Regions:
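Extended, intrinsically disordered, low-complexity segments
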Residues: 136-148, 167, 389-431
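Nucleotidyltransferase catalytic core that binds NTPs
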Residues: 1-141
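Short, basic, helix/turn surface patches
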Residues: 60-62, 91-104, 115-121, 216-222, ...
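Hydrophobic packing residues within well-ordered alpha-helices of enzyme cores
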Residues: 58, 79, 130, 172, ...
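Flexible loop residues that form catalytic
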Residues: 35, 72, 92, 194, ...
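Structural signal for conserved beta-strand scaffold positions within catalytic alpha/beta enzyme cores
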Residues: 69, 89, 118, 304, ...
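Alpha/beta enzyme core
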Residues: 141-366, 370-385, 393, 400
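Short, surface-exposed acidic/glycine-rich loop or hinge patches that mediate macromolecular interfaces
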Residues: 11, 72-73, 121-124, 235, ...
């Protein structure tokens, strides 16, 4: 009997999957691969059903002969192992980023003469409703809040992009790329105080109050499912910080990052060019501990941002603070630098990891932007935040468009640079 292989990466079995099985049975015994959690995150979305439950769900489908684990988005390794006569899939993988997966399958099958079968993709109102329900569940606070911790345990490095509106949230949520035969997407979103302030036309001095910043979070949460890390600046007074923690936790935010400075906020990238005062270790530890005590769940993370390298206080001071902050209850450490060379960041990570192998390390490579995610992960970094790139890329484009319209007294000259209106309409889905 010939063997037919297909792979499912779903939390719910619907008529589309059953149609695949029905077609596959015409060609032979059906083997279904269940995509692992780690691979599912890179390819599709965070699973809402455990891997074990997904395996059981597929096992119970009539007509399935065997169920195996597929550990990678690409099929070449599982095809090499199983050598199926056929691989069957919906024809939606003929275009877009998924085409890379199909090309990978074709290449693997060619080695021994296997065949690929494309069946019409099933997407009707019933399937759309199922997808919508899954998205709604992923967006619920109790599911979203804990997802950052889960991702840290699953991913080599959690890729985080800055967002400051519902629209930028959609970009972070929906952008998937194919490069060098692999698919990738962002794992989490960063609500930056700099970018939030800039979008509102305000200076980055903690002028925008928490009520306004919470509205930004609401706008983003309304249209996304990915976990959110909140830029809490200094955290403010300890007496105020505990209320911020409680509010963010209730909303479903996954983490807050607070920096160990006091007084009027100045952006860290100014370094010693402006007066910036670093908080005492004792006082900042008290703030961290107070925040941890007020939490109602273990899901929410308080991450301590160390400014010692920014303020040229030295590596020893940075490490001393890191270990003290962890002892006070910090769930993670963010180390920052304004140097283009990442050497001091990597030195800190290596020295910290010698004594602490478990506490997550966060970096923001705005200045030292030549280093890759893989290199950071090799030095023990768990979360990388691209903290302002969407804002910084949008402003020059909008400014140039405004200038050209004024220059030519019409909009024709800018049209080639504009996103088609139909693409904007399709980006924002109706309920």
């Amino acid at each position: 009997m010939k063997r037919v292989y297909t792979c499912f990466c779903t939390d719910v079995i619907h008529e589309g999957h059953l149609n695949i099985i029905k077609e596959a049975r015409k060609y032979g015994d059906v083997i279904v691969g269940v995509l692992s959690d780690e691979a599912m995150v890179r390819y599709n979305r965070f699973p809402v059903v455990s891997f074990e439950e997904r395996v059981q769900m597929v096992t119970e489908i009539e007509g399935v002969s065997d169920v195996v684990i597929q550990k990678d988005i690409m099929y070449d390794q599982i095809i090499k192992k199983l050598k199926p006569d056929y691989v069957i899939h919906g024809d939606n993988w003929k275009t877009g980023p998924m085409k890379a997966i199909r090309d990978n399958v074709i290449s693997a099958l060619k080695e021994y003469g296997g065949e690929i079968i494309d069946v019409p993709y099933t997407y009707n109102e019933n399937v759309r409703r199922i997808d919508a329900r899954i998205q709604e569940k992923l967006a619920m606070p109790e599911y979203r809040r804990k997802r950052l911790r889960q991702l840290i345990g699953m991913c080599p490095i959690v890729k985080t992009i800055e967002v400051h509106s519902g629209l930028t949230g959609l970009i972070a949520e929906k952008t998937v790329v194919e490069h060098n035969g692999e698919l990738d997407q962002f794992d989490a979103m960063w609500i930056s105080s700099l970018c939030d302030s800039t979008a509102k036309g305000k200076p980055d001095i903690e002028l925008v109050d928490m009520t306004s910043r919470f509205r930004t979070i609401d706008d983003v949460m309304e249209v996304t499912t990915k976990p959110i890390i909140f830029d809490g600046d200094t955290g403010g007074l300890t007496e105020h910080f505990v209320y911020t923690v409680r509010s963010l936790e209730r909303m479903g935010v996954s983490a807050i990052i607070i920096e160990d400075k006091t007084g009027l906020k100045k952006n860290s990238l100014f370094g010693t060019e402006v007066v910036q005062t670093q908080d005492s270790i004792e006082h900042f530890c008290e703030k961290i501990t107070a925040g941890k005590k007020i939490q109602l769940t273990d899901d929410f993370m308080i991450i301590a941002r160390i400014e010692s390298l920014i303020l040229e206080q030295g590596m020893e001071d940075a490490l001393k603070r890191a270990f003290a902050y962890v002892e006070a209850g910090a769930d993670g450490i963010m180390i920052h630098s304004r140097k283009k060379d990442p050497a001091e960041i990597l030195e800190f990570c290596d020295l910290f990891r010698e004594k602490n192998q478990n506490t997550p390390i966060v970096v923001v490579p705005s200045s030292f932007n030549s280093i890759t995610e893989a290199e950071l992960a090799q030095h023990g970094v768990n979360i990388v935040i691209y903290a302002n790139q969407l804002t910084r890329s949008a402003f020059p484009a909008m400014e140039q468009t405004a200038k050209d319209i004024l220059k030519y007294h019409r909009a024709q000259e800018v049209d080639s640079r504009l996103m088609p209106i139909k693409d904007i309409i399709s980006l924002i889905e109706e309920l």
